[in-house]
Amino acid sequence: MVTQQLQDFARQSVYDALSALFLQPEAKGAYENYVEAMRAAAGLAAELGTNAAPFEAVLDAPAPEPLELEREYARLFLGTCEGTVPLAESAWLHRDEIPLSQLECRKAYADAGLETAGILGVPEDHLGLQLGFLTVLILKNDPAAATAFFEAHAAKWLPAFVVSFRRQTFSAQPADAALFIYIFKFFCLRT
């Protein structure tokens, strides 16, 4: 039987690991935490009777070199050239407006007792920070707030993000792109 606690643990593990990968993929332990999160996700998927194979594939795959992760991250997500996939909500939803999503996220973080202004030099509506905030809400035992925040922010732009991400050519590990898309469908888009 799948308990809410098991679901929350797996979700928190995945959100936390993806947050680190979207903020600093080359950081020590980021990929290892991702592998452990995939172990938790595989367990949850198996309990739910859902395909656990994409998560399990990560467990046996060789770990990429930190420099390889950093290069691929820069190629996919940084810069302004055609094909770059933005990691901020404002890039997807507020191209011609003041980025209200940044202010809304900052307020949500502050209401939860967190301060992000200027941290890491990334906008408050960055996917990594949003996933990190979901982790905090789940750790605070407030999955309802996590779901509400997700629906108010990431759920509005992640489908377009996934479509854009899917169109990219992956130089390092193409299977990781398929896994990433599966993760978002399994955890994020059905939250």
Where are these regions (language model features)?
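Charged, alpha-helix-forming regions
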Residues: M1-T191
